[in-house]
Amino acid sequence: RLAAYPDHVWLAVEDDPDDPDGPERLVAGVNGMCTDLPDLTDEMFSRAELHEPDGAWQMIFSVMTAPDRRGEGLAAALVKHVVQEARVSGRRGAVLTAKPELVGFYARLGFRDEGVSQGSTHGGAVWHQMRLTLLTL
């Protein structure tokens, strides 16, 4: 994904306080692709060629935080940043899928739960498709 659409990978890194000249540590990240298709599907995870740089929708595939940094707001800050970039880019909005226990988290960030995803069973899990609409046509 990084090679296919590097402008759609957002990372939070930090210096090691014990080794400030050493390598940075990844503490949180978000990635996804853009498309004119309105719904997130499993096919998008494996087919980077589906990325449309000027696509109407910012799909969010992964939101991750290092276990020892959870609860600090890093994931929320990155998702808000992605939404702001989508807004500035003139996209219609952002779409993600969330496990049931995370629906409330994304709802607090402005995403609306559209129910169980019909297009994604990634990893054999139940996913809720969630959408944050920025522009309506």
Language-model features: locations:
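Conserved acetyl-CoA-binding loop-helix of GNAT-fold acetyltransferases
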Residues: 65, 71-84
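Short loop/turn motifs at secondary-structure junctions and domain boundaries
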Residues: 1-6
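Conserved GNAT acetyl-CoA-binding A-motif
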Residues: 79, 85-99
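C-terminal "cap" of GNAT-fold acetyltransferases
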Residues: 99-100, 109, 119-137
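A secondary-structure capping/hinge motif
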Residues: 113-115
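Conserved acyl-donor/pantetheine-binding loop and adjacent beta-alpha core of acyl/acetyltransferases
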Residues: 20-25, 29-64, 70, 119-127
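Cytosolic beta-strand hydrophobic patch enriched in CBS
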Residues: 9-15
